[in-house]
Amino acid sequence: MTDAPVISPLDQARILSEALPHMQRYDEETIVIKYGGHAMGAEDTAKAFARDIVLLEQTAVNPVVVHGGGPQIAQMLKRLGIKSEFAAGLRITDAATIEIVEMVLAGSINKQLVGYINEAGGKAVGLCGKDGNMVSATKATRTMVDPDSRIEEVIDLGFVGEPEKVDLTLLNQLIGHELIPVLAPLATSASGQTFNVNADTFAGAVAGALRAKRLLLLTDVPGVLDQNKKLIPELSIKDARKLIADGTISGGMIPKVETCIYALEQGVEGVVILDGKVPHAVLLELFTNQGTGTLIHK
């Protein structure tokens, strides 16, 4: 293990000076940050992320955090002996599973992240989409083609939802008042049923409703890769759709990019897919010239 390079006071001052125009660009702007379960990693990684979020708030940025929790949910289900199945990239969520999902997302993960942000000097408020009827959802549906019959079949995903409406009443009471919303991706139906919502989709819906300056999707890959597995630093919506059509963007990256496109069409200025395991990834993206990850824009 090597020691971190020593930076002279002059270099430290230069770094801060070079960050100034970027800080001014995001002054009083809302940034929605989706923090994936895989990106959370170890406790020190999560605490470093929390410190960066507090730094954003201290520089007059309005951060809104949406967290995932797939690995943590899987771990809890395994401990309880509940089998977990996936279809079309989404967790099939039956009555027993939705209770565990809500406990892990709105309980342990949400409150742990709130604690880390508060420990770093921020004022975080932990919520989920059910609070204040913030995010209303309808039952999600997916189809798959049976490999034998070639017949398209509708998959019952259980209590998995798609955001239908975002009510900003509660969020608007927090944003801009030195409070940092930390949101678990749960929503409710018109009848009061709790739905598990994909965290990327949830973050895209919230960012779109807020007309956020940026949506950052922190994940466990560097961003969108080309056919040679090299990072694509920037894409337009048109370029992204072409890459989906020709298969360059495939698998789990497709719904992420589709979330980016949706958010942009709702008024978000730019969306970035980036590796949340990179130290200070959020600060690198927002406050440096080179940024990090893949920026998708109109």
From Swiss-Prot:
Its main location: cytoplasm. It is found in: Cytoplasm. Its EC number is 2.7.2.8. The record marks 34, 256 as: Transition state stabilizer. It catalyses: N-acetyl-L-glutamate + ATP = N-acetyl-L-glutamyl 5-phosphate + ADP. Pathway: Amino-acid biosynthesis; L-arginine biosynthesis; N(2)-acetyl-L-ornithine from L-glutamate: step 2/4. One of its GO terms (biological process) is L-arginine biosynthetic process. It is an enzyme of class 2 (transferase). Keywords: Amino-acid biosynthesis, Arginine biosynthesis, ATP-binding, Cytoplasm, Kinase, Nucleotide-binding, Transferase. One of its GO terms (molecular function) is acetylglutamate kinase activity. It comes from Rhodopseudomonas palustris (strain TIE-1). The keyword Disulfide bond does not apply. Substrate binds at residues 69-70, 91, 196. InterPro entries: AceGlu_kinase-like_sf, AcgluKinase_fam, ArgB, Asp/Glu/Uridylate_kinase, NAGK-C. Catalyzes the ATP-dependent phosphorylation of N-acetyl-L-glutamate. Belongs to the acetylglutamate kinase family. ArgB subfamily. One of its GO terms (cellular component) is cytoplasm. Pfam families: AA_kinase (PF00696). This is Acetylglutamate kinase.
